[in-house]
């Protein structure tokens, strides 16, 4: 842990097309090796694909993020030689970051032919509470439920 204290939360400018901070954060998480224009093409392409099937793409993205975001997660805590998986609540900013990360990871593993289509399909699935990202959230919740007995080790 840093001795200099915590760093301040950076403000993300809203994206130019939709004027949404959520989409701007999503673009930044899709980005690899600083290639922001490629990430923008992927996210905007996915939003266009969703827009063809659904009326409001931003609402669908928000619904998908809400469905995927975890309420609890487990953290390792070492107590007297034993390591316990202690369930802890997830704060709002981490909840959104995890939801975005899981959506992107599970969309990259999908079988469609292009990344915008993969991302669009995963977002559509997540908005209807199915898909790889939802499985990841359910698995996290199951782990927390199974280790509920160690909740008193919370810090």
Curated annotation (Swiss-Prot):
<keyword id="KW-0687">Ribonucleoprotein</keyword>
<keyword id="KW-0689">Ribosomal protein</keyword>
<dbReference type="InterPro" id="IPR020606">
    <property type="entry name" value="Ribosomal_uS7_CS"/>
</dbReference>
<comment type="similarity">
    <text>Belongs to the universal ribosomal protein uS7 family.</text>
</comment>
<dbReference type="GO" id="GO:0003735">
    <property type="term" value="F:structural constituent of ribosome"/>
</dbReference>
<dbReference type="GO" id="GO:0019843">
    <property type="term" value="F:rRNA binding"/>
</dbReference>
<dbReference type="InterPro" id="IPR023798">
    <property type="entry name" value="Ribosomal_uS7_dom"/>
</dbReference>
<dbReference type="Pfam" id="PF00177">
    <property type="entry name" value="Ribosomal_S7"/>
</dbReference>
<keyword id="KW-0694">RNA-binding</keyword>
<keyword id="KW-0699">rRNA-binding</keyword>
<dbReference type="GO" id="GO:0006412">
    <property type="term" value="P:translation"/>
</dbReference>
<protein>
    <recommendedName>
        <fullName>Small ribosomal subunit protein uS7</fullName>
    </recommendedName>
</protein>
<dbReference type="InterPro" id="IPR000235">
    <property type="entry name" value="Ribosomal_uS7"/>
</dbReference>
<dbReference type="InterPro" id="IPR036823">
    <property type="entry name" value="Ribosomal_uS7_dom_sf"/>
</dbReference>
<keyword id="KW-0820">tRNA-binding</keyword>
<dbReference type="GO" id="GO:0015935">
    <property type="term" value="C:small ribosomal subunit"/>
</dbReference>
<dbReference type="InterPro" id="IPR005717">
    <property type="entry name" value="Ribosomal_uS7_bac/org-type"/>
</dbReference>
<dbReference type="GO" id="GO:0000049">
    <property type="term" value="F:tRNA binding"/>
</dbReference>
<comment type="function">
    <text>One of the primary rRNA binding proteins, it binds directly to 16S rRNA where it nucleates assembly of the head domain of the 30S subunit. Is located at the subunit interface close to the decoding center, probably blocks exit of the E-site tRNA.</text>
</comment>
<comment type="subunit">
    <text>Part of the 30S ribosomal subunit. Contacts proteins S9 and S11.</text>
</comment>
